[in-house]
Amino acid sequence: EFCLGLGPTLFGITKGETKYSIHLLPFGGACMMEGEDGDSSDDRAFTNKPVWARIAVVAAGPLFNFIMAFVFSVILIACIGYDKPVISGVMDGYPAQEAGMQEGDTIVKMNHKNIHFCREINLYLYFHAGETVDVTYERDGKETQVTLTPVYDEESGGYYVGFYENNARTRANVGDSLKYGVYYTKYWVDLTFESVRMLFTGKVGVQDMSGPVGIVKTIGDTYEESKIDGMFYVFINMLNISILLS
């Protein structure tokens, strides 16, 4: 059986020796082969194939998830551009302003980790909340490094270094689309591994992880947040979720 989606089957047809079906939840999918769930006398069955062939089949799934993520990321960047890590402003009295950072500065590194677009800034600060960070920024072709210690805000319950990112999109040519497609794919991989690391180190608990209900809620929240920018952005953000779930 070859199916698209998860959950109850909405529609299915059998053609030749294969059943094709569409399921309720619009993400994920499966390819279930003869002999995968039990013994089969068919020479073509999965369990009757050599070990190297079975390893290749099992490895092909994760490999093509990465390839799919890269292809979708390139399409995403080509269609809507990328967000340069440029500061749009600083907050009065916060570490960024006190360190001399200004509107228009471009963030290059955070604790020696290269930064390519705004989401990487948010990702780093989220997973290192409250930690002192060495920020390298570029202004007029010159790089400067400053050390920022986040300030805790009781009202919001979060830590802030005190600068805003400029989320304006920059048009991408073919080369930029391919290059930032790699960066974007790496971003999602980093996000996934950091989330797992926080789970194992106790920074988040199992109760913070989403099951099917949480995933559906996330999709709903993403739709509400994105629809103001148009249905194309809704589609793109849903695509991002699909990449992560893969």
Where are these regions (language model features)?
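Conserved PDZ fold ligand-binding element
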Residues: A96-C118, T185
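Small-residue-rich helix-interface/hinge motifs
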Residues: E1-S41, L245-S246
